[in-house]
Amino acid sequence: MNKKHGFPLTLTALAIATAFPAYAAQAGGATPDAAQTQSLKEITVRAAKVGRRSKEATGLGKIVKTSETLNKEQVLGIRDLTRYDPGVAVVEQGNGASGGYSIRGVDKNRVAVSVDGVAQIQAFTVQGSLSGYGGRGGSGAINEIEYENISTVEIDKGAGSSDHGSGALGGAVAFRTKEAADLISDGKSWGIQAKTAYGSKNRQFMKSLGAGFSKDGWEGLLIRTERQGRETRPHGDIADGVEYGIDRLDAFRQTYDIKRKTREPFFSVEGERESKPVAKLAGYGKYLNNQLNRWVKERIEQNQPLSAEEEAQVREAQARHENLSAQAYTGGGRILPDPMDYRSGSWLAKLGYRFGGRHYVGGVFEDTKQRYDIRDMTEKQYYGTDEAEKFRDKSGVYDGDDFRDGLYFVPNIEEWKGDKNLVRGIGLKYSRTKFIDEHHRRRRMGLLYRYENEAYSDNWADKAVLSFDKQGVATDNNTLKLNCAVYPAVDKSCRASADKPYSYDSSDRFHYREQHNVLNASFEKSLKNKWTKHHLTLGFGYDASKAISRPEQLSHNAARISESTGFDENNQDKYLLGKPEVVEGSVCGYIETLRSRKCVPRKINGSNIHISLNDRFSIGKYFDFSLGGRYDRKNFTTSEELVRSGRYVDRSWNSGILFKPNRHFSVSYRASSGFRTPSFQELFGIDIYHDYPKGWQRPALKSEKAANREIGLQWKGDFGFLEISSFRNRYTDMIAVADHKTKLPNQAGQLTEIDIRDYYNAQNMSLQGVNILGKIDWNGVYGKLPEGLYTTLAYNRIKPKSVSNRPGLSLRSYALDAVQPSRYVLGFGYDQPEGKWGANIMLTYSKGKNPDELAYLAGDQKRYSTKRASSSWSTADVSAYLNLKKRLTLRAAIYNIGNYRYVTWESLRQTAESTANRHGGDSNYGRYAAPGRNFSLALEMKF
């Protein structure tokens, strides 16, 4: 393990403990004086728990998880958070990172993600890399959340912009960070929590240490978490016995003329004393089949055997055959995923002061870094025999002793990518490698004022919160193309240099940053009379945002110029070989002439004002209601050409009714709406490779809209609870990439019809589904069964109803590939009543992906967003925990205990056209297989 990323938990724990010696001493020897009694009253303050019906009367579509739930489910990353929640999936981006969540048939920026009420970075995709090495130069990832900092997670399925604002079309995921009280045990004024965990599927090792205190009105916490891991390994059977045979090109010295039984003419280099044979391409099929092998056959037939030297040359002229393991093989048919090094580090600090019994003032600091360093192993490291034509016309002259320097190729650089002379040659002898580095950083600083009072008091508010947060999130995606380490070596740090003729390196980089300055205020008041109870919430907010995108592209090539100077005294060709010079270049120099694709920072400034009002009320004992609305006004401004700007005014609402005829049964109905203003990616628009007339502007975009309707039945009692709901969702004005025929003047001023590829409000779609959620307490069903024995069940099914495209557009994007196949999750478990130990088994069954949901029309042609759809699969997981003396908890789990081989749709979806970092040339889908039997271990300590 790299030591600079680690920290000793024991020493750090001691350091934090000694920082609060007085608090520890008081907890150990409490005295019954008045001051101590008052102190104990202060530290019992707890944040209000978030429930499924905290904001809305019905609770339909809501999932709430606490930090204890996350620990019990052994959540080590975003893919573990919703493992047992059908209908919620993670969007894989093909580069180790993720693009957010998929809920109710939509994903990415259509599912809002926030931390403490502050929106996280949008998924931003680069439309093609500048250097032209494929579509994986972009990112499309969002920053991930550090789960050791999280107190509660609220997952809201269905349109919910009245609560979460723009982006909550299919749903929202809202995180709340921990408070000092989350780290302090009851009756104490300080607390320390340490956790160490390991997951075998991606060899991730996590360690976290946190400390909190509360004394004399002051309270605070500090949490440090570090993670280190690798790529997720597929099922072990995938690579068992797999071996690849390759035939690669190389070079040989043509010393003999096999046909004439003579020595080939040599050449000489000015400044060198001895002449040398020319370097020729080994493995060139046309030469071997049409000439060399035929000449050898003729010599044998004529009883003119080859000399030992000639036989050696014939062998050297053949392709180099190698047998490679699944781990070593590179190319489109690779069966294993790309190797990845993952690291993250996070700090969370809070400090505040309570005064007057009802007031709290505090601050927060959060800093999280994540890095995903990948080698793209689908990039073929060698040059295969099918690439021989690239090298066949080279003279084969070289200086020194390394004859392989005489063979190189000049890449076919398209005109729009700039000066062709920037890349004059790439050598055959170098390994062809590609690395993708994805680095994220999120930093937040905030101030908070909170006023808390008893419910139904005569004061002006039961609770009031005023907060200001300053957040910056940056993603840095860099694609390195290297031809500078001699095959078979791989060296990520190598670069083109003058001592390596025809070496080459290229960096295709994209920076994206979002800044938010967010001011929020909320006021809560409870009222009641003889017949009704009301809980009113009034909210205001202002968000000043900025998005900055900046591409970079830079290459270096160490090429040489060889010039024939005639003949030497032996009548042999003589060459003057110039010393290699490193030529630095960038396609940005040419792209500067295209207004749509400049390699300079492009900025969009945004502002959003919102006001919301929500009332959760009851009439008598049979009816509960919720009714709320929100008004948003967004402005986007920019000085950039060909970047959209404008004002968007959106209104959203929610309503719910819960009828409870008795204490065991209830009927609920929920209706809500959602909206999404165009994302920064859509405002910037598609990067295009040709210019437009002065004054041309991109077509305006409208906000996307969503409508959600749900009806549910719920039974609850000593036996547990069961909820069955049916929902319908409709999405309108969905923004998609499409071609639209437009007439523009050409250079002669004549109108010419061309296809303009950009973002348009192109689609409407609707879907419906069923959701089941339940838990059975078997002791409540039959008293003789052990207390703590339970069964959980969850089911979700979504069925698309309609998809309609706007006339005149030829779509270039997916339709419904974000819809998760139907999934069943059934759990059986036992928790010892005193919490000393527990165990459970989770059974999951998923149907296959319906291929019809992958089809869309591009003009008159029917296309599919992926070549394959997943099949049905099932798996079983077992987990257990053991509490020792209330301070130590050991958790363990075995996943896919049957070692079943399967592929989830979420993983296979990485091959879809919507994936920013898609492996378009994959011919082997084994790399997307789920892990085989794997385990996780966690050790938690609380003091």
Swiss-Prot record:
Q: Where found, per UniProt?
A: Cell outer membrane
- Any GO molecular function: ferric iron transmembrane transporter activity
Where on this chain is TonB C-terminal box (motif)?
Answer: 926-943
Kindly summarize what the UniProt induction comment says about this protein's expression.
By iron starvation.
The TBDR beta-barrel domain, residue ranges: 189-943
Q: Which Gene3D superfamilies match?
A: TonB-dependent receptor, beta-barrel domain (2.40.170.20), TonB-dependent receptor, plug domain (2.170.130.10)
Q: Which residues form the signal peptide?
A: 1-27
Span of domain TBDR plug: 52-178
Q: How does it sit in the membrane?
A: Multi-pass membrane protein
Task: Specify whether Cell membrane is a keyword of the entry.
Answer: no
Tell me which Gene Ontology terms the entry assigns under biological process.
siderophore transmembrane transport
Annotated GO CC locations = cell outer membrane
Presence of the UniProt keyword tRNA-binding in the record: no
Looking up Pfam families in the UniProt record yields:
Plug, TonB_dep_Rec_b-barrel
Which keywords has UniProt assigned to this entry? Answer: Cell outer membrane, Ion transport, Iron, Iron transport, Membrane, Receptor, Signal, TonB box, Transmembrane, Transmembrane beta strand, Transport
Q: Which family is annotated?
A: Belongs to the TonB-dependent receptor family.
Physiological role: Unknown. May be an iron-siderophore receptor.
Protein name per its UniProtKB record: Lactoferrin-binding protein A
Q: Which organism is it from?
A: Neisseria meningitidis serogroup B (strain ATCC BAA-335 / MC58)
